[in-house]
């Protein structure tokens, strides 16, 4: 099956794949192309997806959103994430899924999306390139209602270690690919001082978010599995932090917007973290830090 671009294969799935099964598949040692490999030339697609209103309500409660008949932009990332994992766990994906770090995210909500609207979701990979700490790659997502694109997303992942042969990482290293390059980084200097709000995060937040999002990466689920993977305690999902920050701006954002974030230091659970935000010329900038504002966990902007 082929899509609009006749050169790109479309892998049509019967439904959203299991993230847990994809993670397990990605843990199996497989010979891969590595930084000098080739990305799969295909898109993964699910059509006619009916959204689960009860699951959305539970997701909204965990992330701090007001439950409405329209969905948060980050919810559409949650729905496309299983397609990302399916691609990254595939044998023809050049980087090993185990060890990939989600370092930045950009999403565009083109218009409000109703919870009752059926969706066509796609995901593909693009732009395998150097990062100052290894190799980075983009996973692209798209949500359509009929023929209308209502949401697009770009998640950037880092494989630490070897870079592509002959490649040089840009000075920025993280946000270099985005049209809004550098804007999220500028947030750190625009918002100074102590946080304007404190969030107390329970030790089981990772399990709560996993239950509503489907992201069952073991670093978020228990201290035992987190320690096996190099963390002293469980860590909060980066996309929970992203969603919680957008929820804190709820009621102040336009109907259509672009949100860009960088993920910095992981949040070890339980924790008390700080949130700060500013607005200038219609652009909201924000950051999530430790409680005194000295260490940054996430920085971002919305416009």
Predicted stretch roles:
Residues 148-150, 191-196, 293-299:
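Local beta-strand/beta-hairpin segments that build beta-sheet-rich folds
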Residues 106-108, 156-158, 198-200, 262:
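Generic structural detector for well-ordered beta-strands
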Residues 264, 298-302:
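Glycine-centered structural positions embedded in regular secondary structure
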Residues 160, 203, 266:
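Residues that form or immediately flank small-molecule/cofactor binding pockets and catalytic motifs
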Residues 1-104, 164, 168-171, 175-181, ...:
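Hot-dog-fold acyl-thioester-processing enzymes
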Residues 103-146, 256-294:
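Hydrophobic beta-sheet segments that form the core/acyl-binding groove
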């Amino acid at each position: 099956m082929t899509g609009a671009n006749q050169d790109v294969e479309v892998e049509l799935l019967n439904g959203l794949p299991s993230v847990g099964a994809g993670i397990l598949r990605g843990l199996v040692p497989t010979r891969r192309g590595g930084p000098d490999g080739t990305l799969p030339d295909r898109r993964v697609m699910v059509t006619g997806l009916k959204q689960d209103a009860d699951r959305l309500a539970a997701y909204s409660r965990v992330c701090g959103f007001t439950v409405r008949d329209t969905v948060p932009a980050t919810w559409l990332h949650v729905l496309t994430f299983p397609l990302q994992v399916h691609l990254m766990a595939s044998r023809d994906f050049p980087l090993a899924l185990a060890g990939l770090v989600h370092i930045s995210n950009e999403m565009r909500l083109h218009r409000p999306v109703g919870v009752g609207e059926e969706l066509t979701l796609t995901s593909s990979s693009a732009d395998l390139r150097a990062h100052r700490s290894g190799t980075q790659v983009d996973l692209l997502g798209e949500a359509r209602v009929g023929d209308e694109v209502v949401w697009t997303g770009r998640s950037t992942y880092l494989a630490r270690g070897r870079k592509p042969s002959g490649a040089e990482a840009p000075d920025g290293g993280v946000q270099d690919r985005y049209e809004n390059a550098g804007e999220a980084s500028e947030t750190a200097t625009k918002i100074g001082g102590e946080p304007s709000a404190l969030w107390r995060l329970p030790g089981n937040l990772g399990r709560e978010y996993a239950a509503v999002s489907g992201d069952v990466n073991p670093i978020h689920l228990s201290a035992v599995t987190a320690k096996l993977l190099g963390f002293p305690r469980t860590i909060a999902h980066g996309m929970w932090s992203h969603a919680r920050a957008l929820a804190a701006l709820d009621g102040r954002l336009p109907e259509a917007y672009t949100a860009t974030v960088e993920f910095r230091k992981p949040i070890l659970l339980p924790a008390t973290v700080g949130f700060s935000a500013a607005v200038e010329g219609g652009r909201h900038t924000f950051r999530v830090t430790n409680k005194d504002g000295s260490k940054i966990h996430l920085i971002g902007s919305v416009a």
